Amino acid sequence: KDDIHLDEEKAELGMMAVGYYAILESAFRFNKNLSIENQSDFVAEMYAYFSKVASRNKDAWTDSALDANEIKNITKKNSLQAFPYNKYHCTSWNVNQSAAIIVCSEKIADDLDIPQEKRVYPLASSENNHMIGTLQRPKLYEQHGMQLAAKYILDVCQKLKIEPNFYDLYSCFPVAVQMFAESLNLSDYKKFTITGGMSFAGGPLN
């Protein structure tokens, strides 16, 4: 949101999101006491896995799987956007896709002969608008809105004794994916996506 950016932020970073998320990535890494090299390797391996998942997703915009070195190393095709992010770390503006979730009653689904195995029954959703300007956050590596949204879902799962089978942590930049995972108590990046993520399966503003 434009109204939560301070004048100092706009002067230094402009309004391009990659600069903000790159700073959050560095803060997140520093809080974990990880070296730049170790974090770079981890993110590259995670996104290489995402790319592999997307290559098998018929609805993804790309079917070419990238390896970790292709994502990590700066090249003409993978230029530096804002340290530590290269192009392949970021979502692509040029992707033009759309998707829809159709919500209807069970009677309508019956009338339309929707097979039972094709139906999904939503149990809960969570949204949080607890947004704070980047420079106003006490700790750059903590996202309270994200944590509150995740806690609600985790509490519902606990109450209903549900263990989720699938996750899709879908965001423009790696640090947001990692923060989502941490908020949901996930550590294995092979559980983070079933689509391939926004960088390889989709795009922003679609």
What are these regions (language model features)?
Residues 1-108, 114-203:
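Conserved "HGTGT" condensation-loop signature of ketosynthase/thiolase-family condensing enzymes
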Residues 206:
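C-terminal catalytic subdomain
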